[in-house]
Curated annotation (Swiss-Prot):
Pfam families named in the record: RecA (PF00154), RecA_C (PF21096)
Name this protein carries in UniProt: Protein RecA
Transmembrane segments: none
Keywords: ATP-binding, Cytoplasm, DNA damage, DNA recombination, DNA repair, DNA-binding, Nucleotide-binding, SOS response
Residue ranges, annotated region (Disordered): 324-348
Coiled coil feature spans: none
Biased segments, Basic and acidic residues type: 324-335
Keyword match Zinc: no
Listed Acidic residues bias regions: 336-348
Length: 348
């Protein structure tokens, strides 16, 4: 047994000498046993994710039909990162980002790094450079479907380019995944939906870009509109369901229901009323909502309005709900450069 241990110790020394300190270690000695997260900007989604937000150093895929709220979900996460003093980058391959809308959601557009690349290769090379800098806390790519390979852009209309985009994504993710993990960057890939032709049984919907992103993603979120939210005859927004289709850090298949209001994004008051009523932080009796024996509104919309006007009570309820769901922020780490992240470029 001693000979085996001596041989193992010798092998470990050789590995550390060749590849550097920390290249191999016992799992229990690893400093990051608890998953460090950054809030998604939505209380309901933080709860559905099971760990209180998006895990750092991981790849997230957000997909769904057109105008379902995918970019809104990503922009809320960017606003949350910036609010904590972090740096965020947005690679706008669709060339469709609305700065005014982003500002309404709380994004500091003066500090947001923005790139509008010409080709898929350029977009992914920029993404790699940002990740390897070790100074970017969140990177959003909108969208995978718009990452058009250079050969397709330079070719003629009607030319066949079978599997080019899938190969591009597969190669990029092989290079990016390790750097994303080391730099603790959250990489959010927004994706669209396509339909297979001639599928008789099962779900015909697929996401572009091949299978690689599905495998490399720690979390996959499906965003879909459930119903319209009306005030009289005017449509004010959509009730949206965000389903955690894949989750490697907590149980999957949980669903977050949020109100996405036009021009405002996710209604924090709406989801707070729902989540607080679920755990009896807010009491619902008939159509009346009350908090600590005090009525805060008749009907959900009035309760939302009350919380919007009384931010101190809203923050108090939010804190209590997070404690009930055990996502009180104890697994958060400060957003700061570390020796490990800053040495990423030197490793090249």
């Amino acid at each position: 047994m001693n000979d085996r241990q001596a041989a193992l110790d010798q092998a470990l020394k050789q590995i550390e000498k060749q590849f550097g300190k920390g290249s191999i270690m016992k799992l229990g000695e690893h400093s990051d046993q608890n998953i460090s997260t950054i809030s998604s900007g939505s209380l309901a989604l933080d709860i559905a994710l099971g760990v209180g937000g998006y895990p750092r150093g991981r790849i997230i895929e957000v997909y769904g039909p057109e105008s379902s709220g995918k970019t809104t979900v990503a922009l809320h996460a960017i606003a949350e990162v910036q609010a904590q003093g972090g740096t965020a980058a947005f690679i706008d391959a669709e060339h469709a980002l609305d700065p005014a809308y982003a500002k309404n959601l709380g994004v500091n557009i003066d500090e947001l790094l923005l790139s509008q690349p010409d080709t898929g290769e350029q977009a992914l090379e920029i993404a790699e450079a940002l990740v390897r800098s070790g100074a970017v806390d969140m990177l959003v790519i909108d969208s995978v479907a718009a990452l058009v390979p250079r050969a397709e852009i330079e070719g003629e209309m009607g030319d066949a380019h079978v599997g080019l985009q899938a190969r591009l994504m597969s190669q990029a993710l092989r290079k990016l995944s390790g750097a994303i993990n080391k730099s603790k960057t959250i990489a959010i890939f927004i994706n669209q939906i396509r339909e297979k032709v001639g599928v008789m049984f099962g779900n015909p919907e697929i996401t572009p870009g091949g299978r690689a992103l599905k495998f490399y993603s720690t979390v996959r979120l499906e965003v879909r509109r459930a119903e319209q939210l009306k005030q009289g005859t005017d449509v004010m927004g959509n009730k949206t369901k965000i389903k955690v289709v894949k989750n490697k850090v907590a149980p999957p298949f949980r669903i977050a229901e949020v109100d996405i209001m036009y021009g405002e994004g996710i209604s924090r008051e709406g989801e707070l009323v729902d989540m607080a009523a679920e755990v009896d932080v807010i009491n619902k009796s008939g159509s009346w909502y009350s908090y600590k024996e005090e009525r805060i509104g008749q009907g959900r919309e009035n309760a939302k309005q009350y919380l919007k006007e009384h931010t101190d009570i809203r923050d108090e309820i939010s804190k209590r709900v997070r404690e009930e769901y055990e996502i009180d922020g104890s697994n958060k780490e400060p957003l700061a450069e570390t020796e490990e992240t800053l040495s990423l470029l030197d490793d090249e």
